[in-house]
Amino acid sequence: MEDHYGYMSIKNMPMSERPREKLLSFGSQSLSNAELLAIILSTGTKDRTAIDLARSILNTSTEGLRGLKDCTIEELSQVKGVGLAKASQIIAAVELGKRISLTTKVNNYKIKGPDDVSNLLMEEMRYLNKEIFNILLLTTKHDIIAIENISVGSLNASIVHPREVFNRAIKRSSSAIILAHNHPSGDPNPSGEDINITKRLIEAGNIIGISVLDHIIIGDGVYFSMKEHKLI
């Protein structure tokens, strides 16, 4: 229904201009970022179409679409017309995109040194506002089997337990692992706790027969390799 102020719902748009119909007829590549986001949102509000709402969301960051990568539910909910349900839909879609991207990178990816780990994880981890501790599970030839998250939050011995780390490695028949976590401050230099946890995991790995090859700390565009710095 069109009102006196020019508002038109998506249902009253020509079929060829409706996001879902465009996708079905011409493929997802034919849609703009706002149209793709509108499909995820599904509905707009009583006075704004889903496309209008999508444009408002994309305009909340100077980075546009890329800005959604780090948005929180709280930030998205500040956009007029976006409640917890719509914010959750967006966060879920973004997370799926991240996981697909990482899975694509991981396939047949061989680790020859710390640069390879940095190239794989830097863009994903450098802007995180919480510490994330991951392990890279490797074959005997150092091809990546998987990357698994162990903990979220400040790194300490109580949340990074050898049992949890090596249980993942054993389940995936991993011969070796590399530890990786980020420093939200941007400074990748290790803390005493970082070093102690690493040594503890190396000792456990030696007993089990799974080598801990390195511990990479991701900063803002820089990384620290404990192996390179002879800390392990």
Curated annotation (Swiss-Prot):
Ranges for domain MPN: 110-232
InterPro entries: MPN, RadC_JAB, RuvA_2-like, UPF0758, UPF0758_CS, UPF0758_N
Residues reported in the UniProt entry to bind Zn(2+): 181, 183, 194
GO molecular function: metal ion binding; metallopeptidase activity
Keywords for the protein's UniProt record, in alphabetical order: Hydrolase, Metal-binding, Metalloprotease, Protease, Zinc
Gene Ontology BP annotations: proteolysis
Domain of life from the UniProt record: Bacteria
Motif (JAMM motif): 181-194
Pfam family, one: RadC
Record-stated family: Belongs to the UPF0758 family.
Record protein name field: UPF0758 protein Clos_1766
Species of provenance: Alkaliphilus oremlandii (strain OhILAs)
